[in-house]
Amino acid sequence: MNKEEDLSMFFIDTSRHGQAVYDPIVNQSLDNYLINDLALEGHGLIMYINAPCVIIGKNQNAYAEVDLDYLEKNDITLVRRTGGGGAVYQDYGNIVFENIVVGDTSHYGDFSYYAQPIIDALTALGIEGVQLKGRNDIVVDDLKISGMSMVKVENALAAGGTLLYDLDTQQAGRVLTPNQDKLKTKGVKSVDKRVSNLKPLLKGDLADLSTEAFKEALLKKIFHTEDLDSIQRYTLTDEDWAIIDQRVADFYGKDEWNYGSNPGFHYYKTAYYPGVGTVAFNFNISDGVITDFKTYGDMSFGQPDQVDQAMIGKTYDQDGIAAGLKAGNYQDNIGKLAIEDLVSLILN
C-alpha cells in the first residue's frame, strides 16, 4: 500500500518478519508511532493479542487499581496506555483492536462510530444481541465483552478497545483487586463482574477456534472478504520497528511511565458517575487548608493536573473546594458533572 493513498479503511499489519508480536508494552506503544510518525492518511485498523498484562488509563493510580505484588509474582506486565479509560486485564484469550485515523477526525468522541464495524462483524459470526451500551462498552445481552477508549493528537486519533474471547476471568478478578493493606484509605472501585467471553457464544465450526483463528475470522467479516491477502494493507517495515523499539526503550518501557508515582496522601475519595466513569481524589489537609491534591480517573479528555494545581491552598470547605474546582476548569478536565457532586465527594 502506498502511504499517500486515500483509503476509507485499510489494515495495518503489526507482525514482525511475519511473526505475531505479543509483547504488551510494544503493542501499546504502536498507536503513538502510527499517529505521530508514520501518519498514514485515512482510516487504518490494527488488531493484536497480548501476553498476560494489566492495561491502565493515563490518569489512573496503578497503586490503587491493581495488586502489584500479584502481578510481579505471576509474571503479568503492567502497561499504561496513552488514552483514558479504566484498568483491564488481558491475556492470550483477549483481542485488541484499534482504529488509527489520520486526517478526518470528525468522529472523535463518537464511540458508536468505531464500535459499529466490530458489532456488525460479531453479528455476522452468529452472536446475537451485540450492542453499544453506555458511553464506551460493547455488550451481549448486558454482559460486557469490550471496553473502548480514545485519544486525539492534532489531526489524528486512535479509537479502540478489547474483545473478551477466551480470557481467564478468574485471573482478571484477582489481579484487579488491590491489596487493601497497602492503601492508606479505602474507596477503590470494585471489579466489574458482569463480563462475558465470546467463545462460549459461538456455534458450529466456530466454537473451537483459537484466539488467533477467531481474530482472523473477525477481520474477514470487518473487511467483507474470505481472503485477507486481498485487503489493502500496510505492513510495518524494519525502519518502522527501529523507531518503535527506540520509543519503548526511551519511554514506554520505563517504570516511570507505566507505574507512575504513588503520592500516598492521607485522604482518598472515589465515586463512579454514569457517562463519565470513576473519579478519585487523593489529598492532604493541614489547618483546614488543602496542601496536596491529585486527581485520578477514567477520563480520556482534558488535563486533570490543572485541577490539582488549582485546589492547592484552598480551604477545605464547600466554598473553597468549589472555587478550586472552578479555577481548574473541572468540567473540561474531569467531566461534565455537577459541581455539588464533586464538592460532596471531597468533603464526605
Regions found by a protein language model. Give the residues of each.
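Active-site- and interface-proximal helix/loop "cap" or "latch" segments in soluble metabolic
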Residues: 195, 289-348
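Short helix/loop capping segments that flank catalytic or ligand/cofactor-binding pockets
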Residues: 56-57, 64-66, 167, 172-174
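Active-site loop/lid in soluble adenylation, ligation, and acyl-transfer enzymes
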Residues: 2-63, 150, 195-202, 206-215, ...
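Active-site cofactor/substrate anionic-group-binding motifs, chiefly glycine-
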Residues: 64-87
